[in-house]
Amino acid sequence: MGKNRRVVITGMGAITPIGNSVEEFWNGIKEGKTGFGPITYFDTADYRCKQAAEVKDFDPAQYMDKKSARRMEQFCQFAVAAAGQAISDAGLDMEQEDPYMVGCSVGSGIGSLQAMEREYDRLKEKGPGRVGPMLVPLMISNMAAGNVSIAYGLKGKSLNVVTACATGTHSIGEAYRTIQYGDADVMIAGGTESSITPIGIAGFSALTALSFSEDPERASIPFDKERNGFVMGEGSAIVVLEELEHAKRRGAKIYAELTGYGCSSDAYHITSPAEDGSGAATAMLNALKDGGVAPEELTYINAHGTSTHHNDLFETRAIKLAFGEHAYDLKINSTKSMVGHLLGAAGAVEFVTCVKEIQEGYIHRTVGLRETEEELDLNYCRDSYEEEVPYALTNSLGFGGHNASVLLKKYME
């Protein structure tokens, strides 16, 4: 069938550190609200990192029955909740759809560390015969897509992409390709994560990837010269992607159009992006080429922007490499300045942000940004902007050199 089918966004859902719906999340974004605070899940007395961006007031009973909730770890509960919101928002009635043409592409970078920690303790204390029989289906990352498909009767292609911090963006991009090539008419797509656990925080701390700041206002400060690591977040964002004519036939509202997807691999280092930015630059240019958009037509990028020294520097180099002098005309922001780094869900949350920015003509500021260093000399949005956003490019860069960019545009007939 080729790549000639247009793909639009018709529904969105979000469980985030600043709100448990798209409306709450977006209002928080416009207010410059941050979700950072002391870790409450465990005692951090022996940890250098004491801050995280936890989801607040989440009640799985609002989205599923008790039996289902017990058979899911939190990363799956977040995904099922956000997917339910998105499907409801889209007005998608599965009884009216061919279930084999409605698929699922929901990824998690890590799966459930909670289940692994809990059952490992049981193994050490009581022996191998006492390890719970549900450990494996509870912890493996593909159960996010599995549980979403089970919960909503999605019988089409079901994917679980695992590309670390690029998971959410790859998941949406692969769902987009699935619809383009005619393998589905509708895809439920996004990412989810819940890794604020003792081993999760200890592991990322050992990498020196996390901020050790105890001041929530100076913990996640992408592109600032005082940046010292990311703040771990959690949550999920899910979107309904739909073939345009299918959406029009059922009278669906259309938020925006997904029009380009680009990927690359740095083939450079297990944690660091390529220093020259060439891999990320290639992903961005591939997304623009896929969407038929010239680099100089783009005005806005939602950056990966993690608040680590290397990422923000190397992503800046990538933008300059891809856009040349036009890089200085771009507005670039980081949603992680408010919600932290949601790992496998980060790209999906930032995708929802881009949809809302296109819809409302608003580019949010990078909260906490005060002063940059010499090589970081682009416009990283110290202030918000109210202006037309015809296109939005969002980047995700994952451990292992996984790069993904997707291009959205304002929907026009």
Where are these regions (language model features)?
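A glycine- and small-aliphatic-rich helix-loop capping segment at beta-alpha/alpha-beta transitions
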Residues: 23-28, 114-128, 178-181, 201-214, ...
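Conserved beta-ketoacyl condensing-enzyme motif
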Residues: 9, 25, 30-163, 192-201, ...
